[in-house]
Amino acid sequence: MSATASVATRHDWSLAEVRALFEQPFNDLLFQAQTVHRAYFDPNRVQVSTLLSIKTGACPEDCKYCPQSGHYNTGLDKEKLMEVQKVLEAAAEAKAIGSTRFCMGAAWKHPSAKDMPYVLEMVKGVKKLGLETCMTLGRLTQEQTQALADAGLDYYNHNLDTSPEFYGNIITTRTYSERLQTLAYVREAGMKICSGGILGMGESVDDRAGLLIQLANLPEHPESVPINMLVKVKGTPLAEEKDVDPFDFIRTLAVARIMMPKSHVRLSAGREQMNEQMQALAFMAGANSIFYGEKLLTTKNPQAEKDMQLFARLGIKPEEREEHADEVHQAAIEQALVEQRESKLFYNAASA
């Protein structure tokens, strides 16, 4: 963090104010975002997470963007919940190549009572490896939320996806208020929140602004804000949707950074379609977190060694864990910058 004066954290953003941010000249917007970013973060550090699909396919939700929905024929087979030991093996590999947070995702509307004990064991096991833990399991009850917190879960991911106004065009099987209720349960249980959205689903700029307003006007900002670019998958209703303009995507990252100055803004799904120049602009706009590994649940992600090569060219280093920044782990992270390793344990949910 630089000596730049801290920027006030707000929870009262209006649509007119956020529109004005989006309408700034591109260079002015990036300058403002970078100034805000430097007030709270080292601009040359990026937090690195790994995401694993622990249960794939046949989700009862009808999210139009998702290849895991049981409503669409995307060629993705239904798979059972992964064994706890296999999850821990993948987590150990993730740590070895530099990840500091391990995220586990399941294609559920909500976790069942029979699966919860295994999920809790996954959390406990990953924590013992010295990694931060994150899960995305769908809607939670208050009791399930507390059980995850008691097991030591650090983050819970539950995206809002888009604005309340556009939401009904994308999902009908879960309400916006249900998503907000799950986030409230997570906060009440003392866990950190990971929540963001997706660009490229046919939404307007006002919808992008509306999503960010919902997140920034929560009583506390999410600690992590993933901004996804739609990955178009054949068989889903959004497979033929128009591509997001790269500059519009960067603008959204920059506005998210300005509105939520203390949050990690994650450059999430869609990086496979981004060239190195676009990713560099994303970091300039204030993105300071990425998913690292071969897969994002069921879609491609840039290979880990390519990420580290890009980091080296840009002078970026992976962010250390504040609580567990031991010398051995940091040395492994630094070594990953110069080595080219292939991950053999990342779960490829879409493989034939």
From Swiss-Prot:
Function statement: Catalyzes the conversion of dethiobiotin (DTB) to biotin by the insertion of a sulfur atom into dethiobiotin via a radical-based mechanism.
Annotated organism of origin: Pseudomonas aeruginosa (strain UCBPP-PA14)
Pathways per UniProt: Cofactor biosynthesis; biotin biosynthesis; biotin from 7,8-diaminononanoate: step 2/2
Entry's cofactor comment: Binds 1 [4Fe-4S] cluster. The cluster is coordinated with 3 cysteines and an exchangeable S-adenosyl-L-methionine. Binds 1 [2Fe-2S] cluster. The cluster is coordinated with 3 cysteines and 1 arginine.
Entry keyword set: 2Fe-2S, 4Fe-4S, Biotin biosynthesis, Iron, Iron-sulfur, Metal-binding, S-adenosyl-L-methionine, Transferase
Cofactors: [4Fe-4S] cluster; [2Fe-2S] cluster
Swiss-Prot/TrEMBL GO biological process terms: biotin biosynthetic process
Origin: domain of life: Bacteria
Binding site for [4Fe-4S] cluster: 59, 63, 66
Organism classification: Bacteria, Pseudomonadati, Pseudomonadota, Gammaproteobacteria, Pseudomonadales
GO molecular function: 2 iron, 2 sulfur cluster binding; 4 iron, 4 sulfur cluster binding; biotin synthase activity; iron ion binding
Reaction catalysed by this enzyme: (4R,5S)-dethiobiotin + (sulfur carrier)-SH + 2 reduced [2Fe-2S]-[ferredoxin] + 2 S-adenosyl-L-methionine = (sulfur carrier)-H + biotin + 2 5'-deoxyadenosine + 2 L-methionine + 2 oxidized [2Fe-2S]-[ferredoxin]
List of residues binding [2Fe-2S] cluster: 103, 134, 194, 266
CDD domains assigned: Radical_SAM (cd01335)
Radical SAM core domain span: 44-262
EC number in record: 2.8.1.6
Family from the record: Belongs to the radical SAM superfamily. Biotin synthase family.
Protein name: Biotin synthase
